[in-house]
Amino acid sequence: MSEIRLFVTTTEKQAAAILDVMSVNFEEEGYAVATMEIDEKRDVWEASVYMMADEEESVKSRLADALAADFSHLPIEREVLPEIDWIAKSLEGLAPVRAGRFVVHGSHDRDKVKTGEIAIEIDAGQAFGTGHHGTTAGCLEMLACVARSRRVRNVLDLGTGSGVLAIAAWKLLHVPGLATDIDPVATRVASDNARRNGVVDGLTFATAPGFHSTAFGTHGPFDLVIANILARPLMKMAPELVAHIAPGGSVILSGILAEQRWKVLAAYNGQRLKHVQTIWKNGWVTIHLTK
């Protein structure tokens, strides 16, 4: 599904004021907002809010209402953001990524794996997650921390993407796991990656558009849930996600910008989860909480 940018073009001063309006109305729900300079000499700026395509109509209506009092004369414009193969892009010229004992590498870098490292081979494909992004690397580091301190008997990787986190959990813990994604392409890619990494038993892959999927009930509740998604869906799904965590279990949350951390924490503290640790990487955070 495409991502949409709704934006208003104006001066720097007005863009800052509009950003404040956007922040008040959308940031708490996890929408990203931003300003950018377009033309320094002419003082042209854009204030933007980002959402998925199926949310555009609702967000645009709310934005128009929020801007009506002071900025109704400024039109709301839209841009459909390009769908980029981030896997291929992230692997261009990048060395293997090391996070704790894990090393995530492409097939061209197999010879760079050191003795004692847990190697995960992920090549360019159609699903997100090569370890180069701060969220994936943060999850790998946090997974190692959880494994050292808590007993884990089964794992859920929610929004598995390339399958890198599910594969990492299996290689480290050797316990049954369920890896789900709303995208059937991602599910297929993740399953293929698991086989390529020698994981032929113990991991189940399922396309699951929501928690009503029977896969969650069949394989859960889970001692460890890993969800590297985005702040807004993480907050929205908090009650259902927590319901699938076993008593005393853990959840690793990522896909969260540093400034969104407190909002996500509030959503899960509201479900009576306790914060254990936060890892900060390149403007992103990975959070560990327990039930």
From Swiss-Prot:
**Principal subcellular localization:** cytoplasm
Q: Determine if S-adenosyl-L-methionine is one of this entry's keywords.
A: yes
Q: What keywords are annotated for this sequence in UniProt?
A: Cytoplasm, Methyltransferase, S-adenosyl-L-methionine, Transferase
Location in or out of the cell: Cytoplasm
Positions that bind S-adenosyl-L-methionine = T136, G159, D181, N228
GO biological process annotations for this chain's record? methylation
* InterPro entries xrefs: Ribosomal_L11_MeTrfase_PrmA, Ribosomal_PrmA_MeTrfase, SAM-dependent_MTases_sf
Q: Does the keyword Hydrolase apply?
A: no
GO function term, MF aspect, one:
protein-lysine N-methyltransferase activity
- Give the signal sequence positions: none
- Pfam families from the xrefs? PrmA (PF06325)
* Enzyme Commission numbers on file: 2.1.1.-
Question: Which reactions does this protein catalyse?
Answer: L-lysyl-[protein] + 3 S-adenosyl-L-methionine = N(6),N(6),N(6)-trimethyl-L-lysyl-[protein] + 3 S-adenosyl-L-homocysteine + 3 H(+)
Q: Which family does it belong to?
A: Belongs to the methyltransferase superfamily. PrmA family.
Protein's UniProt name? Ribosomal protein L11 methyltransferase
Q: What gene makes this protein?
A: prmA
